C-alpha cells in the first residue's frame, strides 16, 4: 500500500478526466457519480437532515461513494453552520472540500508525504485527544500505515487551509462572523482517516470482546476550554471564559469586547477571530478497520446534545432497513428535544451513517418497505449513565486542575454557537 495510491495504481485507475484536477472540463461535484448531498442513500451510506426551530437549516452533509475514482473509497462529512450566513458557508464547504481534498491526494501521494520542515514528528502531530487505537501507526511498527497516514494527514491539512482561504475571498458570502464545523472521513479499503474541525462528532459502532455492540468515539469536541486550545487562544490574545448566564459553556471572545462568544476553538470562517486563536487546522486521526467494526455515525451537535454515543449506536443497529438509520437517529433526537426541553427550540440535525461490512443499504423511508426502526424505547428520554466524552476526559499530559468529574456532561447543553456579533467600530466592552 505505502502511500495513498501507488504509482502503478494511479496509472491503472480509469478516472474520468472531468473528475480530476486539470483542464477546464471538470465536472461539477453535484454531477459526480456516487455523490449524495441530501436526504437519501447509496450503496454503503445513508443521510438525513431536518431543520430545527431556530430558523434556516444550517446543517449540511455529503457522502461520496467511489471517491477519488476508487471503488473501495468513500468520503463522508457533516457541517454545522453558525452565524448569520452559516447555512451558506456549511453548504459551500460541503460542495468544495471533497474535490479540493481529492486534488491534493493526487498531488501529494506521488511524492514524499510529509516534509520535516513543514510538519514535525508524526507522534507530535497526532491528535492529543485520540484513543490509542487512533494514534500513530508507527506505534505498531507498520511503516506502510505511517506513510499512508502522513500523506493523507498532509492532504487534509492543505485542503482545509485552502478551503478557508477560498471562503475569505468569497464576495457573495460574508464569513467575518459566520462559519461552520466539519467532521469528515475517508475510508479506503480497511484504512480510515478522520479530519475534525469544531464540535460535530464521529462515532464508531464496533463489537467488544464479548461481542456486544458498543460506541467508540473517533473524535473529541474541540472546545475553547481544552488546555491546549485555551493556551493557543490566549497566546493570540483571544479570551476564553463562560458567560454568567451559561457558567458551564466556555466561549472564545475578542480581546476588547464581549463578542462573538464562539463555542468552539476551530472552525471554517469566523475571520473576526482568526487572529485571536481560532484556527481551521483539522484534528486528523487514523484507524484500521477490523471485522468487528460495523458502522460509523457522523452527526452535528443537534444530535449529540440530547443523545449519548451509545444511544445513537443502538438506534442505528436496531433499524431493520439501513436506508432508515440516519432518519431514525434524527427522529429520536427530535423526540428527545421535545421531551427534555419543551421550552427550548430544537436544533438542526444532520446524520450520515456509513456501513462498513459487505452488505448494502436497503429499505426505504417512513411509509416505505424497510422503515420500521425498533428504537430502544426512547432511551434518550432518561438520563444516560454513560458520560459524554470531552477534551478534559483525555489525558494530554498537560497540567489541569479540572477533574473529569467536574467536566462530565451528565446534563446536555442547548447553547447557541454565537452569543453576540461584534461591532467593529466600537472596541469598548459590551455589557451583558
Swiss-Prot record:
Tree of life domain: Eukaryota
Family assignment from sequence similarity: Belongs to the PP2C family.
Native source organism of the sequence: Oryza sativa subsp. japonica
Enzyme Commission number, as recorded: 3.1.3.16
Pfam families to which the protein is assigned, alphabetical: PP2C
PROSITE patterns in alphabetical order: PPM_2
Cofactor(s) demanded: Mg(2+); Mn(2+)
GO annotation, biological process: regulation of intracellular signal transduction
GO molecular function: metal ion binding; protein serine/threonine phosphatase activity
Annotated InterPro entries: PP2C, PPM-type-like_dom_sf, PPM-type_phosphatase-like_dom
Residues that bind Mn(2+) 1: 80-81
Record text on cofactor binding: Binds 2 magnesium or manganese ions per subunit.
The protein's name in its UniProt record: Probable protein phosphatase 2C 75
Catalytic activity reported: O-phospho-L-seryl-[protein] + H2O = L-seryl-[protein] + phosphate; O-phospho-L-threonyl-[protein] + H2O = L-threonyl-[protein] + phosphate
Binding site for Mn(2+) 2: 80, 301, 347
Region Disordered, annotated ranges: 372-408
Keywords carried by this UniProt record: Hydrolase, Magnesium, Manganese, Metal-binding, Protein phosphatase
